[in-house]
């Protein structure tokens, strides 16, 4: 997984008014927490944060903080990100301080590979689970996990337990949960009729 330096500023004052002023100045209020530390309020540039979490790995990039004080050089990952519903810009972020030698639990996006045989035969793809939870060392966090669906027929599904865990990772999500299914026309019609009943 990639590592990126992120310049942040410590903030002593908190509250709605302070956060509003930070956002108006192009900054995002944030909190850093983790094992053995007291939560620390910081702010960071909106543009820098957006660039840091853009791309394939998304929120799972390892970020190294650059600031005054004890947090300088700390490695973090995004634990929670609140976005503006209209402009989709970050409004607040929780950062989890990590130790590169300790395993972390993260959600990783699933990437469907191929066109299912069932879709070619007239079925419909139902992509129910877009990400799964994995546990691994931070350096082994995958950008995404590929799921090959080319052989998937109408009426069949791929479950979490059928997904191969990338090297160095353990999949924590329910192995019985359906990730993707191919539905026939009758099944789709029944699903559409069910909410109306």
Curated annotation (Swiss-Prot):
InterPro entries: Rbsml_bL25/Gln-tRNA_synth_N, Ribosomal_bL25/Gln-tRNA_synth, Ribosomal_bL25_b-dom, Ribosomal_bL25_C, Ribosomal_bL25_long, Ribosomal_L25_dom, Ribosomal_uL5_bac-type. One of its GO terms (biological process) is translation. HAMAP family: Ribosomal_bL25_CTC. Keywords: Ribonucleoprotein, Ribosomal protein, RNA-binding, rRNA-binding. CDD domains: Ribosomal_L25_TL5_CTC. Pfam families: Ribosomal_L25p (PF01386), Ribosomal_TL5_C (PF14693). SUPFAM superfamilies: Ribosomal protein L25-like. Belongs to the bacterial ribosomal protein bL25 family. CTC subfamily. It comes from the Bacteria. Part of the 50S ribosomal subunit; part of the 5S rRNA/L5/L18/L25 subcomplex. Contacts the 5S rRNA. Binds to the 5S rRNA independently of L5 and L18. One of its GO terms (molecular function) is 5S rRNA binding. It comes from Geobacter sp. (strain M21). The keyword tRNA processing does not apply. GO terms for cellular component: cytosolic large ribosomal subunit. This is one of the proteins that binds to the 5S RNA in the ribosome where it forms part of the central protuberance. This is Large ribosomal subunit protein bL25.
């Amino acid at each position: 997984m990639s590592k990126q330096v992120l310049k942040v500023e410590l903030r002593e004052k908190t509250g709605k008014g302070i956060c509003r002023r930070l956002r108006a100045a192009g900054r995002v209020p944030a909190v850093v927490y983790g094992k053995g530390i007291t939560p620390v309020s910081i702010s960071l540039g909106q543009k820098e944060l957006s660039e840091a979490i853009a791309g394939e790995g998304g929120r799972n990039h390892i970020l190294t903080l650059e600031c005054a004080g004890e947090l300088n050089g700390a490695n973090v990952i995004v634990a929670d990100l609140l976005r503006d519903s209209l402009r989709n810009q970050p409004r607040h972020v929780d950062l989890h301080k990590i130790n590169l030698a300790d395993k972390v639990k993260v959600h990783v996006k699933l990437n469907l590979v191929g066109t299912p045989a069932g879709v070619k035969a007239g079925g419909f793809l139902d992509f129910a689970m877009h990400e799964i939870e994995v546990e691994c060392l931070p350096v082994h966090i995958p950008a995404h996990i590929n799921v090959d669906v080319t052989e998937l027929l109408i009426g069949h599904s791929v479950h979490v337990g059928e997904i191969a865990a990338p090297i160095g990772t353990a999949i924590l999500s329910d192995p019985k949960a359906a990730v993707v299914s191919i539905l026939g026309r009758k099944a789709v019609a029944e699903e559409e009729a069910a909410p109306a009943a």
